[in-house]
Structure formats: C-alpha cells, structure tokens
C-alpha cells in the first residue's frame, strides 16, 4: 500500500482502530455470505426466466423503459438463448461474471453496515429478512449496470452479451421486488434514482459518438450513472428516513463519483488508451496534455471525496458507524491513488497521447 491513504489504512490496522474493526467485520461477512447471495440471485433469476411465457414482450417493454433497442434481443434470438439460460449452471456462470465487479465488491459490506447503523439509530426491531431484501435488491440493481455497460461498450464478455440481453429485464424485476419490501417511499426513491441513472447512461453512450466535443456539464450529467444509483441506495439503507437518508445519499453518491474517477484511470491503463468518455479524456483534450488530464482527474476525485467527507459532519451525535464511514472513505481515496501511482509507473503517456480521438 504505497500511497498516503494506504499507509493510514495500515496504521489503523496495526492499532485495531474502531473504523478498521467495523470495516473488517462487514468485509468478513461479505466474504462469508457472498456465495449464498450469488446462489440466491441465480435461483431467483432462474425462476423468473422459466416462468415467463411471453419473453418477447418482456424484451420489448425493457427496451421501451430504458429507451434503447440496442440492449434487447431480436425476437428470433430469444427462444434459443432462453433455453440455454434455463440451465442453472450456465445461468450461474453468467451471474458470477457480472458480479465480478469492483462496485459490487465495495458496496456489499457498506450497505449492510448502513442498514445496521440505521436500525440502531431509529431503534428498529432487527429484521434479517428485510435487511437481506433491501441490500440484495440494491446490489442487484447496481449490478444491472455491469451487463448494460458491457453490451454498450463491447469491450469484454463478447461471447455472453446476448445472454445478458435476455437476463436484464429479469434482473431489474428481481431488484424491484426486493426493494419494494422496504415500503412505498423506498421503492419510489429507487425508481427516481434509476430514472436519473438512465439519463446518465444515455449521455454516456451519446458522448462516445462525439468524444472530442464533450463539455464539463455533459460529463457531470453522465456521472448520474454513479451518483444516482449509489446515492439512492445509501438513502434507502435508512429506509429513506431523515436525517440519515440524506447524509447517506450525499456520502455514497459523492464517494461513488470519486471511485468512478479511479475506475477511469484503471481502465485507461488496461486498454493503454484514455477511456471514452471520461474525465481524463475531457481534461486531456481541453489542456492538450495527457499527463495534465490525469492530474486534474485526480483533483476531481479528491473533490468528490471531500464532499462525501463533509456529509459526515451532518451525522447525529454518537452515530454508531461514523468510524466505519471514515475508514471506508480512506479506502476510496486509496483506490484512486493506487491507480494514479500505477499509471505513472507504467509510463504509457505516448500510447495514451497517440490514441486520443482527433
């Protein structure tokens, strides 16, 4: 952990700080229970796929809702793919592929912690099934962005994109069914967040087509794909109740935008090309300097994280999981710092510059 934040994490680990202990507790729970979640996800998805007697209608409705026919199957493709995915082993493979995501790995322990903190603050009766449904539902909703991104980007899992197209409507329905267990307001907040995220996703796709004319405002709008989903999920871990709901919304939304910057740096290293669209691309083109572009991206990542940390100042006195959130934001800081440091070490500036869109 050769970053400033990494050294702070190590120090907290050595001294077993409260934040470290809480974070470790939820990380261990994630590692233990994740296989159960993946199995549950697969089986419930399988039930929906098998029970659907009108998969073509399901595809069309999903395409209308998300505003794109590019992410649904042609009617002639549906039956053979549906038949293939009705094999539990095949479906489980696809589920595990889309769950192999940094966002999922980072959010699972966080949502459980936020739900527990809310339960304690509001003196709710402990309800393990409600906790499972609310956390599962939002993880599944967030995970929907993985296959949708892969379908649009066509940069990984090329052999499975049609399978993902069939799965997407059922993933969304499963998420909705679980989130609805939290009540009308919780579902309403999710729907609003999902709608905003679709706006961000649409802009993301649009900006790919004219990448040299990206504006700061457009790129900020496209980041709704991060902040709307994560912010809404944060708020809903408190069942959309104040004051925690608003603090969780801002904190999780801004932290996810910070992670988004780190992810763009990571992807640029992997592809040896600046991600399109992204903050590194916007800044590289506007300054005519790729190094400066990534430097400014790090500054933006820090700005997002500072906003997330400011939200913690609004937490109630004696809030049980304050130290957890402070430690969490330290890990977010380390993520971006780690990939920025790796970028400097890789020294691929000439590749990045030569592949900039003209």
Description of each model-found segment:
Residues 1-358:
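All-alpha prenyltransferase/terpene-synthase fold signal
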């Amino acid at each position: 952990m050769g970053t400033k934040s990494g050294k702070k994490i190590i120090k907290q680990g050595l001294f077993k700080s409260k934040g470290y202990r809480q974070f470790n507790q939820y990380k261990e729970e994630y590692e233990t229970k994740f296989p159960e979640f993946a199995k549950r996800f697969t089986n419930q998805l399988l039930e929906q796929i098998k029970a659907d007697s009108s998969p073509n209608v399901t595809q069309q409705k999903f395409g209308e809702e998300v505003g794109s026919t590019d992410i649904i199957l042609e009617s002639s493709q549906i039956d053979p793919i549906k038949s293939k995915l009705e094999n539990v082993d095949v479906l489980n493979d696809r589920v595990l592929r889309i769950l192999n995501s940094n966002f999922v790995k980072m959010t699972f322990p966080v949502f459980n912690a936020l739900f527990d903190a809310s339960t304690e603050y509001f003196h709710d009766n402990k309800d393990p099934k409600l906790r499972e449904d609310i956390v599962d539902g939002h993880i599944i909703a967030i995970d929907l962005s993985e296959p949708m991104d892969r379908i649009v980007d066509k940069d990984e899992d090329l052999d499975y994109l049609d399978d993902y197209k069939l799965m997407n409507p059922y993933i969304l329905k499963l998420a909705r069914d679980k989130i609805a267990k939290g009540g009308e307001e919780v579902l309403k907040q999710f729907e609003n967040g999902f709608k905003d995220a679709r706006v961000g996703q649409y802009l993301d796709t649009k900006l790919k087509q004219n990448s040299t004319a990206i504006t700061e405002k457009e790129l900020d709008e496209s980041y709704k794909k991060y902040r709307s989903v994560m912010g809404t999920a944060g708020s809903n871990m408190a069942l959309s109740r104040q004051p925690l709901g608003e603090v969780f919304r801002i904190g999780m939304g801004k932290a996810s935008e910070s992670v988004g910057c780190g992810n763009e740096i990571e992807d640029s290293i992997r592809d040896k090309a600046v991600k399109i669209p992204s903050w590194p691309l916007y800044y590289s083109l506007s300054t005519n300097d790729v190094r400066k572009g990534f430097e400014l991206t790090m500054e933006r990542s820090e700005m997002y994280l500072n906003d997330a940390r400011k939200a913690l100042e609004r937490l109630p006195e004696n809030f049980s999981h304050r130290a957890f959130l402070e430690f969490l934001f330290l890990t977010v800081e380390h993520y971006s710092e780690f990939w920025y440091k790796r970028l400097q070490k890789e020294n691929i500036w000439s590749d990045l510059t030569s592949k900039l869109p003209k």
